[in-house]
Amino acid sequence: MEPAHASPAIQDSRVPGRSRRRDLVEIAIAYGLILSVIWTPRPLQHLLWWAAAAVIALLVATSFEGCSAAGLGGRNFLRSLWVVAAALAVSAVAVAISSHLRTLHAPGSAWHFVTSYWAYALWSGVQQFLLQCFFLSRLLRLLPRPWQAALAAAGLFALAHLPNPFLVVLTILWGPLACLLFLRYRNLYPLAIAHAILGITIAIAVPGYVDHNMRVGLGYLKYHRGQRRAPQVQRSHSDHRASTVAWVTAAAPTLRSRIQARP
């Protein structure tokens, strides 16, 4: 018998009055808009950004099943805080290795750190909401097994990070784990916090020429053509409109530190 706190995750996926066709159409529309933004050059990309955001927000609003089903309540929050602790442990190891290799490029002060990454921290929560509460919730109704829905949602998440091999591998690892943890605890907050911790760790520990400033899609290819040598100064992501963190639009800034240590 499954633990009592795990079963509601499956039961909540059954919504009376919703058809499988509607779920499939909504997934296709949202994911198609995401990919169109990732692979469209500016200035058209800006228009698609707003179109994608508006359409996905409308789909979420018209199908919202409540805070509890979305993992926005307090249920199992304390039980799942170990996920945050695990992310902090991974981050500490990565930072230590990066410091040893002299690739660490964290902001020079706590204030600079907060101002550089607060937007990315919020965006991490948005990504997890869309992965778990939009795609996973619909795939749970389309596929016969929860683990199949978790793998399918994670697969969509990973494909949105092409052609960046570094980020595809990381999302293949994180995506299924995040989905399965959500199904077990049905609480989004620890996953969002862990996502922010791990993403910021990548931003400050991995040189930009390795992960192409965390770009995906057309932005990744343009970086590859235009900048082949290791940069001495890492620019903010705010001047790039094709970032890997754009699970919705691929355009939200990751705000990497402006100070890049030489490797």
Give residue ranges: language-model regions.
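Alpha-helical transmembrane segments in multi-pass membrane proteins
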Residues: P16-F64, R79, V83
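Function-critical hydrophobic alpha-helical transmembrane segments in multi-pass membrane proteins
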Residues: A106-L159
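Short, Lys/Arg-rich, polar N-terminal cytosolic tail immediately upstream
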Residues: M1-G17
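Membrane-interface helix termini and inter-helical loops of multi-pass transporters
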Residues: S68-L72, S99-W111, H212-R215
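Functionally important transmembrane alpha-helices
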Residues: V168-G226
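Juxtamembrane "helix-exit" motif on the non-cytosolic side of transmembrane helices
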Residues: S36-P41, A96-A106
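N-terminal polybasic/positive-inside topogenic patches
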Residues: R229, P253-Q260
